[in-house]
Amino acid sequence: MIDFDALVRANAPLNAFTDFDGSAEGGGGALAGLTVGVKANIAVAGMPWTAGCEVYRGRVAPKDAAVVTKLRAAGAAIIGMLNMEEAALGAKTDNPWFGKTQNPHKTGYTPGGSSGGSGSAVAAGLCDIALGTDTMGSVRIPAAYCGVYGFKPAQTSVSQEGLELAEEWLDCIGPLARSLDLLESAARVMTDFGDGDTASGSLVTLAETGVDCELEVIEKFRDVIRLAGSEIALAQLAHPLSRIRFAGFIKTSKAMAAHFADAGGDKLSANLKKLLTYGPKRSDADWAEDQAILAETAQAVQDIVAKHAAIILPTAPQGAFSHSEDAPANQADYTCLANIANLPAISLPMGVDDAGMPLGLQIVGRTGHEADLFQLAREFDAKLQAYRRPDHFLAK
């Protein structure tokens, strides 16, 4: 029996869930006994399907998204809808229509985004598994900021049916959980999970990325390099990560501007309206350059992963920050690569910063070799032992 009264009380200071389904029940199967929260841009039959947008307030999903159908069939109880950044464009989750979501590790701090409710709910023990969506890092950044585990599948490995898309080419649905075992259980149910032959080659990281990282992130990542136990190769991309990420943002802004072209002006926040201007106002020459950069980067990252076992990077250049601060432009500099190259990636806890906020390690692997990716994550997880339960936690 799910104690929804306890869930409502524990959720109140966090605003991770926007709606609960008090009638939710699980069944038999691989996920029997587990509860799942679903980001508000993923359809759950009979539940609000807002995508964090005022323009969709009152919309109710007519049927489950394909991934939700798979989770139900595996026995999971789908218990409610999770807060998110408006239209999934941003990485802070201070939604102007549905409120700010708090990081369970520190009230007043962002859980990341755009799947901020997903990261917060899992970290606080409100659900066992949460579904998020990831356009350029929106599963992995909340996983890092909230100190949990997040999996971004290759876009071609998971259905988009029932997802309110941000950008069709970049978007995918992925799970978050408090352990790699739970994360893999969800991933095996909802994605085309590959048990291909063990990937060979050394680990690799990127040199001269141009990303301005917080000192604690640099120090913790150096610890990861030392713990790897083998030599880490270096690779370099032709463009700074900030330029690559911006090209992805322009692509997303163009798609979303077209999507919301007929939305009432008073139904979109001033911030979202501003973000939706960048793509349409881009000159033809600059847009051609953006597309070339995305294509070149996709091929380069795929080539690096084909040669090496996996790429390791920080998940984000910083830990969670106060809601009173502006979001750094570089939040998705590291995470955008897996979307641009259509590759699977995991974020796992790497340690904490000086403020005690979690930091994340990202591992990007090969499509069809997801089992290898999880095994590598387990090896690092055992060495780092960095998962920490927040004080704000609902124990079952």
Show the residue positions of the predicted features.
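Gly/Ser-rich, acidic/histidine-flanked active-site/gating loops
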Residues: 36, 45-48, 188-250, 278-281, ...
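Short, well-ordered beta-strand elements within core beta-sheets of diverse protein domains
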Residues: 55-59, 171-178, 278-282, 363-364
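A short helix-breaking turn/cap at a secondary-structure junction
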Residues: 16-20, 24, 149-222, 386-396
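Glycine-rich, small-residue loops and helix-cap segments
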Residues: 39, 73, 184, 190, ...
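Short, well-ordered alpha-helical
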Residues: 1-60, 65, 87-90, 320, ...
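Charged, often glycine-rich, active-site loop that binds/positions anionic groups
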Residues: 94, 98-99, 244-259
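Short helix-loop capping/hinge segments that flank enzyme active sites or metal/cofactor-binding pockets
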Residues: 31-51, 250-298, 302, 349-360
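Short glycine/serine-rich loop segments
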Residues: 69-187, 339, 344-350, 357-360
